[in-house]
Amino acid sequence: MARLDRGPVSGAACDPDMSAIEVRSLSFTYPGADAAVLEGLDWSVPQGAFALLVGGTGSGKSTLLSLLKPEIAPTGEYAGELRVLGESVADMEVRASAERVGYVFQDPENQIVCETVWHEMAFGLENLGMSRDEMRRRVAETSYFFGLEDWLHRDTDTLSGGRKQLLSLAAVLALRPRVLLLDEPTSQLDPVAEKNFLHALFRVNRELGCTVVVAKHQPRPYATCAYRIEDGHVREVADMASLGRRESLFSDDMLGWGAVRCAKNGVFSRREDNLGSLEPPGDVSSAKKSSELDKSSEFVAQTSLENGSGAFPRTDGSRILQK
């Protein structure tokens, strides 16, 4: 079997001239609140990006992400326009949302609802009315991609925090979303589990062409771009890959962004010459090298030109395009 091509994924999913997320003049106020948590916010994320949404507690980053997912959108006074892959979130049906937008919570205990790993991965598929044969195929493909095939009959309660979060990610990806939103997904993980989770997330972005947006308190050097949100506005944007020393981009103080200002309007254009230079976060070989990372690296991912989605491998080595 051919080893995975680490070059940029082709196709619509990684088109830097198209937006995966488009937010215009967004304002949102929680019931009973004296002030809006988001006010006149403009924000755009290109397709295929690995983006960080960085801000402190109360900055509005979690609210912004949840508003892009109709099933979990908070109650409150809302104005403005939100679009995902060109479709208005306000008009998006639940099925379309499930198949377009994936969401991973900070705490996997808030996301895992089934007793076994297999049933957790099949839960969303069953809710969409998928046939049992198709569910089995999806679970097999996704578990193999993430290296979870040996976990399928394990009780979810027996998994470590890092494995639970990886399971949450895999269960979401079984639905084949094209945009993936994550709210502080590694804040409760130890350093080894965090590195393995980020490596899996990086593969989802690079190999499947999935646009990834991660909300974090502090910026990290592994992203394509970072957006700083403060007082309900996207204040600044950094093109992480175009700067020499990405490790020293930001100070611990969130006011230390002056040296990396690339744009003021919350719109980032991903430069094609930056794509090939990106590497997985950290030295993966120094992390706890689990069997899932070794096995899954043997497959070639392919992008569907019809819908811009990536491809999950079959367990026999052939590939299945996302539907």
What feature does the model see in each segment?
Residues 69:
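Helix-to-loop junction immediately C-terminal to a conserved catalytic motif
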Residues 133-151:
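Conserved ABC ATPase "signature" region
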Residues 77-88, 97:
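Conserved ABC transporter NBD signature motif
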Residues 155-159, 163:
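Conserved ABC ATPase signature
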Residues 180-183:
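Catalytic Walker B motif of ABC-type/P-loop ATPase nucleotide-binding domains
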Residues 176:
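Conserved catalytic motifs of ABC-family nucleotide-binding domains
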Residues 17-23, 28-40, 72-75, 91-93, ...:
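A short, flexible loop at the N-terminus of ABC-type nucleotide-binding domains that lies
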